[in-house]
Amino acid sequence: LEGEQVFENNSLISEKYYDKNGKITKEYRFNKLRNGILKKYYKDTEKMSSTSTVMVNREKVDGVEKMSFIFDGETKVFREDGTLMAILQYKDGSLQDLTQKFYYPNGKIQYYIVAASDDMKDFKVKDRIITYYENGKVKQDCNQQNNGSWLCKNYDENGKFLDEEIRGAEPISNGDTKFWENILNQVLEVLAN
């Protein structure tokens, strides 16, 4: 069995796809507006790799109907061990101006950011960045100022306020363009499979 489709009143409401060993690889569930949930699974384990709210785009190419998905809403990305890696927010396929969260392997939040663009090679953040310790306590809470600098409040591992500082560069990456690329590549690799 490679796949199965479920119809209701001549309308497709769900699809499931399987690998050669019969393990589920993808499934979609639609509502009548053609929006739905896309779930993907790691190969051979049937552990969920991601779940996404999507808009479905159907078009005919050379007489064959092709279906594609546009991320629109929340996407959760999981590591192979089942722990949450990231929660991404999309609007019409774009991350721009929306909050994004990245998690430690222990399940605690690591970064809370607002995406400034969709460019993954030169990813930038804006407005607010919060970094956390592995215990879940806030490490640094930064707000972007009108002049582009960042006002950051620093805390110790117990949550006690330490100091406040003004940073010229974006506080997490300190201008290192590869920093966000490395984090995002892990997430994008899971979503691509």
Task: Report each predicted region and the residues it spans.
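Glycine/tyrosine- and acidic-biased, solvent-exposed loop/turn segments at the edges of beta-strands
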Residues: 1-193
